[in-house]
């Protein structure tokens, strides 16, 4: 297995994984939208995406987005997406992707990584095993824009 930073040139190998990831979260399959979304993130340099491959085949990814902590005066990343293809799960690929993201943050001297997950996501055990701590100091709220785009 190899983990590397993906580029715009990797989009075609990422799209099937990204589309499957969205389907997992009950979104309709739409490879064209997945391709457009990823292409825009890469073009605007808005993400860092680590791609896991086995014998050259893309099998998993994690995607990070940069943000900042005004209190600590340091940047940190939001680990927004983590996905491993069904047939490659339980092989340590998810763990390797998470560890790679942590190493990347250490190298960049970022404050850390934040992630959110569903209450019933079994990966919570993995996150805690790898050093993530459940933040019980804050409540997280989200406002949804219900107006349609023009």
Language model regions located:
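Extreme N-terminal starter segment of soluble prokaryotic enzymes
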Residues: 1-3
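Residue-level recognition of the GNAT/N-acetyltransferase active site
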Residues: 85, 118
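Conserved acetyl-CoA-binding loop-helix of GNAT-fold acetyltransferases
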Residues: 84, 90-103, 129
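Conserved active-site alpha-helix within GNAT-family acetyltransferase domains
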Residues: 95, 119-137, 143
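Short beta-strand-to-coil "C-cap" segments at the C-terminal boundary of structured domains/repeats
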Residues: 142-148
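Acetyl-CoA-dependent GNAT
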Residues: 5-12, 16-74, 80, 135, ...
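Conserved GNAT acetyl-CoA-binding A-motif
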Residues: 105-116
